[in-house]
UniProtKB/Swiss-Prot annotation:
Protein's name in the database: TDP-N-acetylfucosamine:lipid II N-acetylfucosaminyltransferase
Protein location: Cell inner membrane
Cellular component annotations (GO), alphabetically ordered: plasma membrane
UniProt pathway: Bacterial outer membrane biogenesis; enterobacterial common antigen biosynthesis
Alphabetized InterPro entries for the sequence: WecF (IPR009993)
Length: 359
């Protein structure tokens, strides 16, 4: 049997590194279909830190796409698992037959599914991508994204799968030792990416709570984002006093980020799509409820796991937030499907499906 090849077709260092390390640490030892990767980006020590993997790096999207298409044409039994498919050339290859449906398996990350960009080239490309998506052999995604995808592509097979968030299961009870009282601290957004709509989110928080809460905005990723960070800072200072606004412009190490989250009382995410599942997982693990846009279908995954969900359209106050905290504190976090290690079973099944080992 031909070994499955995994494709990270865009240079998204943080997410690509997370996927590679997860495969190296959790999957490669038990499956030959978890070892071969084609990745856009620089090595930057990844080969050394992932010795169980065979990783081929490419300088750009086009060079990787050309290599994938060549492999697909040379051997029609070769199957590919695309993780977060942001590479237009690969969509066009699927649409034109360069890659066959039986060769194309896609793990939806969220941003690669929704049509939120307003630029002309995106508006021209989206209809073509939609046509190509009808030809995918199987999609893997969160429950909410599967539901969203099925509305337009009901005939494409869908399987539940969660991004492998880096988590320590021993911290599932860490919320129990924190006393929550006094001024609330609210985390706004999951990164410095513009998709978080930071300014609109800050205005929404201010409309709900006024200048009575402390707002923390993590913007250390992506790099070279100083102009946008300053734009958010100025907008924030028009709404909140300086002591109540904390803009984090430096990237935090994982342990420091965990410590930051533990100081929060609420996460506030205004974006109208599924994204930031890593931050949501870590907040929920710490017993911190999240406010979501109703258009973000991840609320379906949360309710399926019997977790409280607050919405941006709700009338929020401290009593409501504290009640959601109480409900989270009483939830059995060891059974949550999108937590580590529970998502591992889904990955093992996904590998078997994509490799053709199970129907």
């Amino acid at each position: 049997m031909t070994v499955l090849i995994h494709v990270l077709g865009s240079d998204i260092p943080h997410h690509n590194r997370t996927v590679l390390r997860f495969f190296n640490d959790a999957l490669a030892a038990t499956s030959e279909h978890a070892r071969e990767f084609m990745v856009v980006g620089k090595d930057d020590g990844l080969s050394d830190s992932c010795p169980a993997l065979s990783v081929q790096f490419f300088p750009g999207k086009k060079s990787l796409a050309e290599a994938v298409i060549a492999k697909a044409k040379a051997n029609r039994q070769q199957r590919f698992f695309f993780h977060g498919q942001f590479n237009p050339t690969l969509w066009l290859a699927l649409l034109s037959g360069g890659i066959k449906p039986s060769q194309f398996f896609w793990h939806i990350w969220g941003a690669d599914l929704y049509e939120l960009s307003s630029g002309l080239r995106y508006k021209l490309f989206y209809p073509l991508r939609r046509l190509a998506q009808k030809r995918v052999g199987c999609v893997f995604a969160t429950r909410g994204d599967l539901s969203f995808f099925a509305k337009t592509h009901p005939k494409v097979r869908g399987e539940l799968l969660y991004f492998p968030t880096r988590m320590d299961p021993s911290l599932n009870t860490m919320a129990n030792d924190r006393q929550r009282e006094g001024k609330m601290t609210i985390l706004v957004g999951n990164s410095g990416d513009r998709s978080n709509e930071h300014v609109a989110a800050l205005r929404a928080v201010h409309q709900q709570f006024g200048d009575t809460v402390k707002v923390v905005v993590p913007m250390g990723y992506p790099p070279n984002n100083e102009a946008y960070i300053e734009e958010v800072r100025q907008a924030g200072l028009e709404l909140f006093s300086e002591e109540n606004l904390q803009i984090l412009s430096e990237k935090l190490e994982f342990d420091a980020y965990l410590a930051l989250l533990r100081q929060c009382d609420l996460g506030y995410f205004i974006f109208a799509r599924q994204q930031g599942i890593g931050t949501l997982c870590l907040l929920i693990q710490a017993g911190i409820p999240c406010v979501l846009n109703r258009e973000n279908p991840f609320w379906q995954d949360m309710t399926e796991q019997h977790l409280p969900v607050l919405f941006t359209t709700d009338d929020l106050n401290e009593d409501i937030v504290r009640e959601a905290q109480r409900q989270l504190a009483s939830a059995d976090k060891n059974t949550i499907a999108f937590f580590s290690p529970n998502y591992l079973q889904g990955w093992q099944r996904a590998l078997a499906i994509a490799a053709g080992e199970v129907a």
